[in-house]
């Protein structure tokens, strides 16, 4: 549910240091920039908890599964689907897979498959040996989840993002700018949501660490904007297997108070 925006920085850094290149959503942290693998399969576990402006807490468990295919040197295609369990009073998930406010109900538990997400990422040529890395990503989220269970708004959402990083020695600062275009579900007043993230990635021992500050405008005027800090560590644990651990802390009522998870990625050349 977090931070595909930071993957491009980690990718550029790893490529510059070791000739090995490694994104919401979080599974793409390992996948996005891997230039040595043609197909990447990922799965893991994510837990988040927060009040989202409501008196009662909402807990969300996500078990994601994703595939990413490097079609050419400059084009990557991806798809992801997740099993979701949500417990709390705000039981309608918005375009960012977080509860929408304004739905006061008794505390409920709902679960099932979420929306199907598909993406395409274009790596902009910056010249051989250039320290710059620029990725442009478009994503569509299709309403395949159960609307009656509150796991989707029932409408198609779109997003675009630009990720820019610059390699300096063993680290790479990065910035990401994005925009999510929400569908228009009946009875729910949603608005489009810009986002921004700034941070850095660095080689640490046999792995890589990334930290960032993330902001996203709330999809609803009833909610606060999301402000959070994020950190992740990723390393190779076998020839074709990477392990990533991550966590974030919310700085506003519009973000989860805490979020954390792990991700395993298998790579095929």
Describe each model-derived feature in a short phrase:
Residues 1-33:
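Cleavable N-terminal export/targeting peptides
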Residues 21-169, 173-184, 193-232, 240-246, ...:
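Transmembrane beta-barrel domains of Gram-negative outer membranes and organellar outer membranes
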Residues 188:
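Active-site cleft segment of glycoside hydrolase catalytic domains centered on the general acid/base Glu
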